């Protein structure tokens, strides 16, 4: 937990949930260098917690957030400035981020922070953008941002922005972070990365033997990730999410997952979370339909 001090009257907390890639197939490469893919995204009930405090000027300030990330590169700040620009407004905000998701873990933490910022500020600032417009803005920040705005577990194609809702099982997961940094750019440029997986249809999921095409490369480049996969595989089939470094496995009950979670070896961190087919952000927005007037104090 963060020691971040949230001021009285700040709006929140608003969740920025983690996601898992239940499988990840790379099906090609576009002329601009981006890979085309097929995947299924599912959310977790484990999230960063964001608070927003409106300002009387147009400044955007960040408090907390991912350690070591400069303010100008923080996706919350970039999302807020992008919304300012798109809506042509002169409103400001202080953003407080109680960061719980690891940076660069393959859980989409930065993208989720950006999506929650766009979603909440669209309401707080009264900009009135439609969901499709927010998704277009989100895609400019990262390929994973649209699914967090979409708010449903989804079959994804393109670079991850073409989304169709799906309803996979919602098991309990053990998620392990082997505490190494995996460079997505390095994985995606690795000459041994599979880039021609056969295309599936949505009806092939979940009966197909899906896998993560990045896993072999990440295993080779990062022995700690390979060790985490091997350790978790002893209890339940384990997979990499995104390009890692986090790995996960599904369990039928919370008790089973917690029993494994308590045995995570020293030097790694882990948590137990429930898979969700609807984003906690959207669930909260539905409960708050009367207006975004929730204050933390």
What is the predicted role of each segment?
Residues 2-104, 123-132, 159, 177-179:
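ATP-binding N-lobe of GHMP and related small-molecule kinases
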Residues 2-15, 21-36, 127-237, 250-297:
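ATP-dependent small-molecule kinase catalytic core of the GHMP/sugar-kinase superfamily
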Residues 22, 50-52, 76, 110, ...:
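Residue-level signal for inorganic ion chemistry
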Residues 56-69, 117, 139, 204-212:
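Short, basic/glycine-rich phosphate-binding loops at helix/coil junctions
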Residues 80-84, 122, 236, 261-264:
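Conserved hydrophobic residues forming the short capping helix/wall of the S-adenosyl-L-methionine
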Residues 81, 116-122, 136-139, 146:
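A broadly conserved amphipathic alpha-helix scaffold signal in soluble, globular proteins
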Residues 96-125, 143, 237-251:
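Glycine/serine-rich anion-binding loops at beta->alpha junctions
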